[in-house]
Amino acid sequence: MILITYDVSTETREGRRRLRRVAKTCLNYGQRVQKSVFECQVNSMEMASLKDQLLKEIDLLKDSLRIYRIIEPLEKNREEFGNRLAIDFESALIV
C-alpha cells in the first residue's frame, strides 16, 4: 500500500485544472482519505505508472507530491478514528 499526498497551487485556472487531474488520477488507483491524501493498493508496475502520470500533471516549480510506502500488515500499522473508515480492498465486495 502507498499513501499519496499533494499540494497543488490553485492561484490560476491552470492550477485548478492540475488539481482536478491529479485527484482524478489518484482516484483511478485508490481511495481518497483526506482532500489531498489517497491510499492506494498497487503493485510495482501500477506504482510506476501512477508515479509517471502524476509527475506529468504536477508543476515541479509550484506543486509538491509525496508518495509513502506503507509497511504491511496494515491492521498493525494503521489506526482509524471518525466516520470515514478505509475500505478493505482485500476482502470480498458485495454490490
Language model: regions and residue ranges:
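Extended, hydrophobic alpha-helical segments
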Residues: 1-33, 37, 41, 45-46
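A short acidic (Asp/Glu
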Residues: 14, 50, 78
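Short, intrinsically disordered low-complexity segments
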Residues: 34-64, 69-71
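C-terminal structural segments of small proteins and small subunits
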Residues: 58-95
